[in-house]
């Protein structure tokens, strides 16, 4: 079959998502079953894989969906526990002392705290922690979800202590003789040095693209959720937003160059938190209290902004609790994530031991395997911390029981969307080996694009990485699928293939901004079920920016300078954004 036709067919399940979820605004619970059926139809009818393989991929998807629902439940339970104990009210007052300005708060929580959680745990965990915290502070649920999705970009490639590089890129490249020969020819004696070399390039690309992410967060927040529906209110804090961005990305790049791929996100975010919180307390670059920006009265909020989990001041207990005690559950979450993710501490191997791992190998006689390691899942940490909080905050049994009951009802509503979303993904990426002889759908699509773009491939490479993450819900899986393909394309068009692999990793991180099952999960955490398409519509421009800028920059780098198509496009993008911002600010009174 013609590669272009095959690529268009492979695009169909994604086109169904785009049409019904994003354009027609169907809820994910209705759109994703259609996408699943489309993927199954293609797998059986065009790729001609066996019914057993489709069934095995579906079962694996259901198992993964169950683990996601467990994580969502744990995150909701922790939020409801803090609501019932009164800690949320204390945390809210604490943030008011740092700054009552919602723009400052969202940058600290979503951009910095969220990046720290991403660096510690990865795999969408920031949405499970930062998004409900924002709702607890009084943000509309949809505003919190949009902010939580936007920051799942810069820190993602080094999330989970570098998993997308150390597992994703590593798995994709390490067994290929041509890649090994290339690394040795470039003087890398150790494979780990070669991975770190790619990691530095990834960090540089992220730092340049990520410099505007905090500004995107506040500008989109004021545009979609402010009383004035204006970008201006967000753009007014551009100095603080850029300062917060550099406070994280500068140490992020330094750490990538000196310590390797494990620590850029976690240490960059920690250093950034220390700098930005200290500066905010001292009033550096933050608006004066009388100029603080807030959402309008809740009575004026649109119904679509509000999730099933709504925290009202008059519902809160007023405990005698200090700020440290109120924050202690989140500190415990952060501590447990680090303790269980750093192998040298000795806990991670215990949690991943075969004795506490449930595996199903060769499902229905296929090569597909599924496994669950429940003690290692972030959901377990959330549940354990909730139980500790029950004792630590001296809660009553009745109020704690309410937290469990409300959490169970909320997570049930999200289950329909996820039990079709993840199986669709698994059928899509497990579609190789059929009688038709086609490669799996993601590779077929990527090869079709590569055949059309030719030497302009570096501009498109991040979009393939983003597509992989959009489908699979993981930068790591995207890198595993496409790193070798990207390396091969780079080598074929005569440019440094490590830059192309770096563009893949950056694009894979950007894909998390619009990834369907990440949006479903983040929305479910705050009870915002059925409005996933609206979230993606709001975050899609940020994804395009975050894929296009590194692509243009990468094209310029591999072609030796800025005086080429990539460099000119990069200048045009930033000039256009600057002109737009200046015009918006001129409208300001």
At which residue positions do the language-model features occur?
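Long, contiguous bundles of hydrophobic transmembrane helices that form the permeation core
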Residues: 1-10, 211-363, 530-540, 548, ...
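Alpha-helical transmembrane segments of multi-pass membrane proteins
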Residues: 103-115, 141-154, 167, 181-214, ...
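Re-entrant/interfacial helical elements at transmembrane boundaries that shape
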Residues: 125-133, 149, 162-174, 220, ...
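Transmembrane helical segments that form the transport core of multi-pass membrane transport proteins
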Residues: 268, 298-464
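Structural signal for alpha-helical transmembrane segments and their membrane-water exit/capping regions
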Residues: 2-7, 17-53, 74-85, 276-287, ...
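Membrane-interface interhelical connector segments
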Residues: 164-199, 433-454, 481-488, 492-493
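Membrane-embedded alpha-helical segments and adjacent helix-loop junctions characteristic
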Residues: 55-63, 67-140, 145-146, 395-489
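Interfacial loop-to-helix junctions that mark the boundaries of transmembrane helices
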Residues: 1-6, 25-31, 54-66, 197-205, ...
């Amino acid at each position: 079959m013609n590669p272009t036709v095959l690529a268009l067919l492979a695009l169909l399940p994604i086109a169904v998502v785009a049409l019904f979820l994003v354009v027609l605004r169907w809820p994910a619970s209705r759109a994703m079953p259609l996408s699943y059926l489309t993927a199954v139809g293609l797998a059986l009818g065009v790729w001609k894989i066996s019914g057993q393989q489709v069934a095995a991929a579906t079962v694996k998807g259901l198992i993964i969906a169950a683990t996601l629902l467990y994580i969502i439940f744990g995150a909701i339970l922790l939020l409801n526990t803090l609501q019932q104990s009164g800690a949320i009210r204390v945390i809210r007052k604490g943030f008011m002392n740092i700054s009552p300005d919602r723009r400052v708060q969202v940058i600290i929580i979503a951009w910095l705290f969220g990046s720290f959680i991403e660096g510690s745990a990865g795999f969408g965990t920031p949405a499970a922690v930062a998004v409900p915290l924002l709702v607890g502070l009084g943000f509309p649920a949809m505003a919190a979800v949009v902010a939580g999705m936007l920051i799942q970009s810069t820190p993602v490639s080094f999330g989970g202590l570098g998993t997308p590089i150390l597992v994703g890129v590593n798995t994709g490249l390490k067994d290929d003789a041509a890649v090994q020969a290339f690394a040795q020819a470039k003087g890398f004696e150790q494979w780990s040095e070669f991975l770190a070399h790619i990691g530095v390039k990834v960090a540089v690309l992220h730092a340049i693209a990520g410099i505007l992410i905090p500004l995107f967060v506040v500008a989109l927040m004021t545009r979609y959720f402010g009383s004035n529906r204006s970008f201006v209110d967000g753009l007014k804090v551009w100095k603080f937003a850029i300062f917060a961005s550099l406070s994280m990305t500068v140490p992020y790049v330094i750490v990538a160059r000196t310590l390797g791929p494990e620590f850029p996100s976690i240490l960059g975010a920690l250093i950034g938190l220390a700098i930005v919180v200290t500066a905010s307390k001292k009033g550096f670059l933050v608006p004066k209290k009388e100029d603080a920006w807030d959402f309008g009265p809740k009575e004026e909020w649109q119904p679509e902004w509000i999730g099933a989990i709504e925290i009202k001041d008059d519902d809160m207990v007023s405990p005698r609790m200090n700020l440290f005690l109120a924050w202690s559950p989140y500190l415990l979450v952060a501590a447990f994530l680090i303790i269980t993710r750093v192998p040298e501490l000795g806990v991670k191997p215990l949690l991943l031991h075969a004795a506490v791992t449930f595996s199903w190998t060769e499902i229905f006689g296929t090569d597909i395997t599924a496994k669950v390691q429940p003690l290692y899942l972030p959901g377990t940490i959330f549940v354990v911390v909730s139980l500790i909080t029950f004792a630590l905050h001296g809660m009553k049994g009745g109020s704690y029981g309410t937290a469990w009951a409300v959490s169970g009802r909320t997570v049930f509503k999200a289950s329909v969307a996820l039990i079709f979303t993840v199986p669709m993904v698994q059928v899509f990426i497990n579609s190789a080996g059929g009688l038709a002889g086609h490669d799996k759908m993601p590779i077929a699509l990527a090869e079709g694009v590569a055949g059309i773009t030719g030497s302009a491939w570096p501009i498109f490479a991040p979009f393939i990485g983003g597509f992989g993450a959009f489908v699979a819900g993981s930068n790591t899986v995207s890198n595993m699928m496409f790193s070798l393909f990207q390396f091969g394309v780079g080598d074929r068009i005569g440019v440094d293939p490590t830059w192309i692999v770096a563009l893949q990793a950056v694009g894979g991180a950007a894909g998390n901004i619009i990834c369907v099952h990440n949006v479903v999960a983040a929305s479910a955490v705050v009870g915002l079920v059925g409005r996933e398409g609206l979230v993606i519509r709001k975050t899609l421009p940020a994804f395009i920016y975050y894929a296009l800028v590194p692509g243009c920059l990468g094209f310029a780098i591999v072609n030796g300078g800025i005086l080429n198509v990539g460099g000119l496009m990069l200048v045009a993008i930033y000039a256009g954004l600057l002109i737009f911002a200046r015009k918006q600010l001129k409208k300001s009174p």
